[in-house]
Structure formats: structure tokens, C-alpha cells
Amino acid sequence: MSAGKIVQIIGAVIDVEFPENAVPKVYDALKVAEGGLTLEVQQQLGGGIVRCIAMGSSDGLKRGLSVSNTGKPISVPVGTKTLGRIMNVLGEPVDEQGPIGAEEEWAIHREAPSYEEQSNSTELLETGIKVIDLICPFAKGGKVGLFGGAGVGKTVNMMELIRNIAIEHSGFSVFAGVGERTREGNDFYHEMTDSNVLDKVSLVYGQMNEPPGNRLRVALTGLTMAEKFRDEGRDVLFFVDNIYRYTLAGTEVSALLGRMPSAVGYQPTLAEEMGVLQERITSTKTGSITSVQAVYVPADDLTDPSPATTFAHLDSTVVLSRNIASLGIYPAVDPLDSTSRQLDPQVVGQEHYDVARGVQGILQRYKELKDIIAILGMDELSEDDKLVVARARKIERFLSQPFFVAEVFTGSPGKYVSLKDTIRGFKGILEGEYDHIPEQAFYMVGSIEEVVEKAKNM
């Protein structure tokens, strides 16, 4: 173990001088002797000086402090001992439940699986959320992105997915909280405890108030834990909230390291950083990682470089829309903007495909007619168009659903709707079986039977 000393401190960026013959490698972890702060080497500047990012607050550091080289990258505990625990970016427990006691530690920087190791899957993963199962179905071992601006329900949707999938699915899950609110992390912990699934989830948090180094690396820490479960032959769920904060931390670090910014001030290495993370989130012939990632969309602009870079890596995209949220329809998923590679007759079957496309067709037609209705009113429409509008409004409302995790706010019990019931319900609306039922009956219910029941009491 070689020793060096701090020569410069600029916020979270720290320069350390080592003897010329013992300069640490890029990504090596260094330890400050006083206080035990971990640093990660980012650049070698020449003359024995390395530039590092602090994995914690740099308060109280001063020039001349001794720093030792661990000779290896940041390593975190992996395996079943991490289940039910809350850890930070370094894999240290933050839940006051004693040491993790894992038998094995893995470095957080790893190679992505090679081309021949990867496997593709077309098996569907049922979520119990109507709009998702119908319009943008998830694949087991696939990657899903939840896109949305501020306050349209990304985290609530994520929590509902975790509740539905983690409870129905008996495997293990890893949750990486990347630069999100500590309150949400706390809520999530209690939600898992109340649902009795905490012993199947590993939690890794690097919250909003932490330095950029923590937020940049915490996604890799969580991913490393998920990879261990996958390599043991399990099917793992990997949840990330929020991928945008990972990009943002990269932007902060990049600026501190003195790189020239690119479009909109993002780091020049944006696509590469995203690729390094996303290429590791993949299923192999041994086991699968199904990942659900929340993606914040700055100023509701999907063409912003950060969400646009994320799009390329995903199998399903669930786009949450402020317009739909403003109508009081939750989950506020936009059925015309959301996509899935699984929505193919050879994967989901002809009936599911036809119903999904039929629903999108009617909603698209309604969208086109809205301008005419706004100017001339409903009376000027042809009988056929009036029917389209009536059915579209019913479909819009039937796409809403009460969530288990939102019971406290809505006061109505959550509903899990099977894919079979979802297809049957929407097929009935498209075929005109429910034309006689008022549209209010379709709002915030589970299956189509509940609509019929609700209509009787109206």
C-alpha cells in the first residue's frame, strides 16, 4: 500500500500526490488517514499527482493529510446478507442494524457480459396495472423506463410496480435510490416492511444531499449487488430511482474535473457513462435482471439529451403526461407516447395486439377531433365520430386505476388486474358492449365487472 498526501481541494475534487513509482490506477480507491474518507481516482495528471472524487463530504480536509492507496476499486458486500439492509455507496450499513457480515465483496467497476453470454427473453411480466400491461407490456429480463416531469407520479408508479411485482414475484430485488429525496427512501423502507418483503430487497441509497461522487457511483453499487444474484442463477428485479440524477451527478463531477461541457451543459461523456451502466443491466444464460428505471424529464422536454440518451437502451418506455395527470387520471401514462418492443403479435398474441392497437387508434382519433369539438362543439360531429368520442372517453377513464401504495391518499383500496381481465375489458368497450354505461362508471376501478356494479348504483 503506497501513501501520498493531499495537495489541492476543490469542493468534491481532491488532488493527491504519490511517489512517481507508486501512482494509483484510475478507479482505485484511496483512504484518507484522518477521518477515513474514501476517494476514487479519476485522472492521472502527471508528476505523481492523481485527481480524485470524494465519496463523502470533504469538510475538514486540509492539504498535507496522508492518503493510502487500497490498490483496488471500491468494493461492496454482495450476496444474501445484503437483503433487508440499507447501505450507502461504499456498501456500509446505514440502518443501525450492525455489520453486513457478507462472505464476499465485489468491485463496483465490472465488465458487461459478453455477446455470447447474453440471452434474450420474450416472456411477459404481468404488473397488474391495466395501462402498462395493455399498451407497453414488460418483458422478463427487459429494461423499462418511467419517463415524466416533476410531480406526475414516477415514484408512486415505481412503488406500485415494486409492490405488485416483488410480492407476486418470489425472487430478490435491489433498489438503488440515486439522488432522490430521503423522505421517499424512508417511505419505501416502511412500505417494504409493512408488505413483509423487506427480507427479499437490498436497498442502496445515495440521496440528494450527498456529494456528487456518491450519487454517481451508487447506481453501480446497487447494480453490482444485482449482478451477484443474477450470476447465482436467480431472476432479479433492479429498480433505479432516478437515472437523471445519475447523469446530473456525472455533469457535476465532469465540470469539477475541468472537462468542456457539451450540449445543454451536460458532460461530453454522457453517452458513454450511460452505456457503461446500461450495458451491465442485462440478462445472461445464467439468470436475468429485469430493471425498472425512473427517468426525470427536465421541463417536460423528452428531447433533452439526458432522457434522449436513456431511450436508446430500453425495451419498454412508460411516458407519464402532465395533461393526463391534470384530468385526474392516475396512473398518468400516455397511451399514445408509451412504447414496448413486446407489443408484437408473435410475443403477446394476436388478440392482445389488436385490442392495444384498437385502443390507441380510438384515442388518436379522439385527439384529432378535440380541435373540432373545441371550435364547433359536439353537435357538429357525425354519428360515427360521436361514438368514437364516447368510447374514447370511457377508455381514458378505464385506463385509470386505484393503487395499493396510494390508498392513504385516495381512500379507495388498490386493485390488481390480471392481463386476461384487462384485455377482456378493453375489447368489450371497443366492441360497444358497454355503450349504455355512463363514462363516470369507468373512472378509478379495477376490472370491467366493477364498472357494471358501479353503474347500477349511479
From Swiss-Prot:
Record keywords: ATP synthesis, ATP-binding, Cell inner membrane, Cell membrane, CF(1), Hydrogen ion transport, Ion transport, Membrane, Nucleotide-binding, Translocase, Transport
Catalysed reactions, as listed in the record: ATP + H2O + 4 H(+)(in) = ADP + phosphate + 5 H(+)(out)
Membrane topology: Peripheral membrane protein
CDD domains: ATP-synt_F1_beta_C, ATP-synt_F1_beta_N, F1-ATPase_beta_CD
Transmembrane regions listed in the UniProt entry: none
GO cellular component, one term: proton-transporting ATP synthase complex
GO molecular function: ATP binding; ATP hydrolysis activity; proton-transporting ATP synthase activity, rotational mechanism
Residue ranges that the Swiss-Prot or TrEMBL entry lists as coiled coil: none
Its job: Produces ATP from ADP in the presence of a proton gradient across the membrane. The catalytic sites are hosted primarily by the beta subunits.
Residues annotated to bind ATP: G148, G149, A150, G151, V152, G153, K154, T155
Pfam family, one: ATP-synt_ab_N
PANTHER family listed in its UniProt record: ATP SYNTHASE, ATP SYNTHASE SUBUNIT BETA, MITOCHONDRIAL
Name of protein: ATP synthase subunit beta
Places the protein is found: Cell inner membrane
Disulfide cross-links: none
Main location: membrane
Xref: HAMAP family: ATP_synth_beta_bact
Database matches in Gene3D superfamilies: 2.40.10.170, Bovine Mitochondrial F1-atpase, Atp Synthase Beta Chain, Chain D, domain 3 (1.10.1140.10), P-loop containing nucleotide triphosphate hydrolases (3.40.50.300)
Enzyme Commission number(s) from the entry: 7.1.2.2
Source taxon at top rank: Bacteria
Record text on subunit structure and interactions: F-type ATPases have 2 components, CF(1) - the catalytic core - and CF(0) - the membrane proton channel. CF(1) has five subunits: alpha(3), beta(3), gamma(1), delta(1), epsilon(1). CF(0) has three main subunits: a(1), b(2) and c(9-12). The alpha and beta chains form an alternating ring which encloses part of the gamma chain. CF(1) is attached to CF(0) by a central stalk formed by the gamma and epsilon chains, while a peripheral stalk is formed by the delta and b chains.
InterPro entries registered for this protein in UniProt: AAA+_ATPase (IPR003593), ATP-synt_VA_C (IPR055190), ATP_synth_F1_bsu (IPR005722), ATPase_a/bsu_AS (IPR020003), ATPase_alpha/beta_chains (IPR050053), ATPase_F1/V1/A1_a/bsu_N (IPR004100), ATPase_F1/V1/A1_a/bsu_N_sf (IPR036121), ATPase_F1/V1/A1_a/bsu_nucl-bd (IPR000194)
Gene: atpD
Enzyme class: translocase
Sequence similarity: Belongs to the ATPase alpha/beta chains family.
